[in-house]
Each structure stands twice: as C-alpha cells, then as structure tokens.
C-alpha cells in the first residue's frame, strides 16, 4: 500500500483519495496505467476552454468515484473517449485492459451515437442496448460524461450550448432519473435551465433567495418540533431541510399553473432513520403533529419506484397552514436515492479481486424493474428501430399502452382520453370522433384511459364533421393538441378570408371608388407583396383578423394607380398597426430641427417612434413636410431608394416636447402582475396610452405598454424600475410597429 501510494501520479491523488474511502483494497496500478494511456492518446488535443483534453476524462472519473463506482468503471471513464477520438482501437484497449473495460468503453461510444440521434447499424444497436441493460455502468459513465460537459459548457458557442442543453433535458436527465441518480439529475436540469432560459433561471434564483430568511426560520421551527417528538418517542433519526431545485420549481409553475408562493417544494424536510420500522413510526409522529393532506401519502418502500427508489412521502398542513412535504427513509435508502444504481456498486462485498461480478450483485441489478423492461423490449422488438423508439418514449414521459379492437398497440401519455387515442390512430379519425367504447362499454370522450384497455372510437360520416372546442380542455397528447389547434386555426382563417373580402368591398364603396377597377388580382397581388403577405388570400385574411385595415389597403391600391398626393407618405408608414392609439399631443413641438429650413413642418414617424438619442433621418413628404424616421426603421430601405428626398435632421427637444415610447415586459406570470407593472410606470410619472398582456402556455406573461414621456433620458431609470417588479426577468424598448 505504501509503495503504491508513493508511485501514484500526483494528478490522480484526489481521485485515489475518494476511491480509497470506499475501496481500501483497490488495485490502483490499473488506474495509473489507464491515466498514462489516456494522457498519451489525448496529448495533442485541447478542450474548447484551452485546457488539455485529459482534464475531461479525469473529471468524469472523479465524478464516478464520488458516486462510489468500482475501479473498473473508473478505468473505463479515463479511457472512454480514446477509441472515438484517437487512433487507439477497441481491440488494443481490450487486450491491454481486459474485456470488461473494453465492453464499457464500447458501450459508451455507441450510446453517444444512438440515443442522441446519429446513425448506427441496426444489429449493433440491439447488441449494445442489451449489453447496456445487463451492465448499467455504461449508462452511469454516460451520465457522468454529460455532467462534466454541462459544467464546462460556457466555452462552447451559444447554439451548441443550447443543443446540448436540450439533449440533456430530453434524454440524459431522464436517464439519470430512471437510474435513481437524483443528485445528478437535479444538477443536469438546473445547468440546462440556466443555458436555455437564462433570464427565467436568474429570476427563479432571485425569488428563492428572497424567500430564504423566512423559509429558514419556518424550517427551523418545523425541524425542532419533529426532533423533539421523535426523541420523546425514542426514535433515532436525523431531520434536515431538503435542497431547492430551480428547474423543478419552474416546471411546477408551468405544469400545475401555480404561483411561486404556492409551490410546496420550497418548504420540505427529510427524516433519515436507522431501520425501516422507524420510518413507519416516524410517519405516525409527523401525522400526530400536523393534519395529513388526503391522497398525498406514498409508500415507495413497499413498492420501489423503477425498482430503485425507496422512501415514504407525505404532505401535511404544517404551521401557519402551509403545506409541508416530508420524505422519510433509511440512510441506505437515502444513499440510493441520491446516487441510484451507482450506490449498488459496493464491490468490496459484491465483487472479488478477479473482477467477476458475483451472482448476488447481478441479482440485485436484475431486480431493477426498468433494467428488466429494457431486456424485455429487446426480446420483443421486431427490429432495433422499434426497440429504440420504446426506449425514447420511456425516457420522455410516463406512458400507457392501449389496444385497438384488432389488437394493435397504441402508446399514449398518462391521462390520455379516447380523443387522444383517435388522433393517434389517424388525424381524420380524431377530427370525426363522436363517441367511444372502452372494454366493450360506452364511455364519455373525456374519460381517462388506463393501461391494457381496448378502445374503439365511432366516427361521423358528415362532410362537415370536425373537433369540438371543448376537447382542448381535456386532451393531453401533443399530437391531439396540435391537430385540434390546426383545425380551428384553419377554420378561423377561412372565416377571416370572407370577412376581409367584405370589409374591402365596403371600404371601396364608402369612398365612391370603382370596385372592379381598383380591386383586381394584379393590384391586390402587388399590395400583398408590398405588405409582406404570401398571397392575396393571406392579405384578405389579415384584413379579416384585424392585422391590417381595409382603409390602409385601399390607400395602397390608390397609390399603385398614382392616386392621392400623400400616397408615398402612406407607403413610408405602412407598418403602423391599426391598433396603435393616436398620440394626444398638447404641442406641435416634436423636438426635431431641419438645418437650413427653420419652421418646416416635421412629425415623428409612427412606424419606428424615434426618441432623442436614436440616429434619425428626414424624409420629405409630398406635402412639403418632413417625416422623421430612425435609420434602422423597417421602412428605411424603401425610403432610401428615393435618395433625393432624404435630408438631414437634428434632435432639438424643448421642455414642451413629448415623445411616444413603447416597451415590452417579460415576466413569470402571477396574480396582480399587470397591476404592479402599471403602478411602477405610474410612479415614474409617464402618461400610459395603452397596455396589453398575453400569457403563453409556459406561464410567461408578455406585456406591451405605450406611453408618452417628455425626457427620454429618463427611460433607463424607468426600465430599471419595471425590472425590479417581482417576477419580471426582462424589459426593453420596442418600436410601435414591432
């Protein structure tokens, strides 16, 4: 031992120190040899950070050592990129380090290509997945590999960061979850969250930190009550607060539609006992202190989740009437909950020095339900593609399997209804669905399906049959939601098309104009192109939906025919939305001067709403006035085609000048958000002209405010004031046409 310690490479000392705590008799010479080979093979390679590439496999090995993995796994981790990224062959690696290490390295290499989408030969996939299920260390290495990559992701280009973060959320984090590796899963999710939604992440962090003092006081009170009662009941246990995970908080805000203040996970405790019987006794103690909430007790000790996770969960009405989540488990169960399948690798008991897995360890792994399911799928799948699809589904969401009357299997998300089933069969079957029979009995269309049920749907033969708007309230599958939404969007477009045609006819007749001469295919196509619509039908639809007014289109048609004098000015301002309110000005002073032409009439263009500080240009209108635009106005290119009409203009604001400003506010939706933002604006003494807010499906509120202000230099202070409103993660100026 002493000799071995003295010859260990200093770079490996941290890894060796952690590994020795669990495996004091581990053979460290093979670790040393693996590091030397990896260091030599990666010698000419650098990470994106500029660090030597060897730092990556070394970091992965350290993560696995902290998880308690065996020596063989650490060796494979050190070598896991050599076959793919260097000239080192799998045959040479296997000959030097043995079949077990070779199998692990080969599995990690193939898993990279398969699960994340690259092509691979069918039978190779089947063999690799089978081996993966029989030796889950392949999966554990892959998860650790991605964890280190996510920790160092800041050195990659933003688009690659986003792609990797999405892969991590969709595949790797769920994989860690299925392996029971909770601590790794949470870190992967939070790292991905910070990359994909940085502003939302920062706002959640800020909100959690803001509640920390009151939360800590509350938890201290709860912990003291539990500890005192457990001690009085002679139950030996440790009580601790549970860590907060930002992605989990954000998901609950979205999926359950909760405000931040209503999320139970912010207040939770964990009780760690010595014996299983003490866990059940501790539940009794907790329920004697506070009223349990109905339906919130889960016994994962008797029925382990995924065959790995064991714990008792309960939610009670705690002090001050707040929901309190409590987890109760033994210390061994907690180690498994944190490290999952990795916690089973205590090879000092399960494995001999010859590197062979003992039968008792193999049986322990085989008890894991998800691993058995992988092997079952491998046996049943007709081809590797079918098998891989099953794996992808299982990683993504909880699924149920139901049958058609002919015995075909349909996979659906948990909570699906006969309508989801109908759309899974075919889009037209979904659209025409009018009833359903489950296991031979008629059921309501909103009835939730369960595993193994036989579902039959009835369809309408009416030519105008279509979905009901009510279905949107209970379908859960993405396919059904998308198809129903597309149906009604198409229906609305058709109605808007006819409405738009009628509006155009009324507007032309109101002006006493020749309808046939003015509104024809050629002239309307020209205006559609000018207004950036795909075709004439799209233009009519936009009119019917109120995106552009019929009056504006008629004015453009007149300009095409050389009609009214102000046609070109209308062209310059065609992007002004019909809903933008007019500015009630108390003065004609727009704060702009024209060098060499004092007293000339000027006005600020509505399409880009310039304010002092913006770079501007003047455009001489047909009436002799000057329209002032930002140089980055959406209409700048068309204006500059008439260079003779572009003139210099300068800002010259006076105390009486008033400017129109529009801002967009993005925030995590909550009760009274609009009221609080409006109050912040009012406190800044601006005259609010209009406000609108829309809320997306992911609980993000997008608000638009248009207001008048005298001194735009004050805008930065105003934006900061709005940004300080709770839940707001971004606020910025937009043009009125944006």
Curated annotation (Swiss-Prot):
One GO location term (cellular component): plasma membrane
Signals that turn on the gene: By MazG.
Binding site for Mg(2+): 265
GO terms, molecular function: ATP binding; GTP binding; GTP diphosphokinase activity; guanosine-3',5'-bis(diphosphate) 3'-diphosphatase activity; kinase activity; manganese ion binding
Residue intervals of the TGS domain: 398-459
Outcome of swapping residue 81 to A: Loss of hydrolytic activity
Keyword Hydrolase among UniProt keywords: yes
EC number(s) per entry: 2.7.6.5, 3.1.7.2
Outcome following mutation: residue 633 to A: Altered association with RAC components
Keyword GTP-binding among record annotations: yes
Regulation of protein activity: Transferase activity occurs when RelA binds to a complex containing uncharged tRNA, ribosomes, and mRNA (RelA activating complex or RAC). The addition of charged tRNA to this complex has the opposite effect, inhibiting transferase activity and activating hydrolysis activity.
Signal peptide: none
Residue ranges of domain ACT in the record: 662-736
Domain HD residues, every copy: 53-150
Record note on disruption phenotype: Cells lacking this gene fail to synthesize ppGpp in response to starvation.
Entry's free-text remark on domains: Based on a mutagenesis study of the catalytic fragment (residues 1-394), the (p)ppGpp phosphohydrolase domain seems to encompass approximately the first 203 residues, while the (p)ppGpp synthase domain seems to be found between residues 87 and 394.
Similarity field: Belongs to the RelA/SpoT family.
Official protein name in the record: Bifunctional (p)ppGpp synthase/hydrolase RelA
Species this protein is from: Mycobacterium tuberculosis (strain ATCC 25618 / H37Rv)
Lineage: Bacteria, Bacillati, Actinomycetota, Actinomycetes, Mycobacteriales
Gene: relA
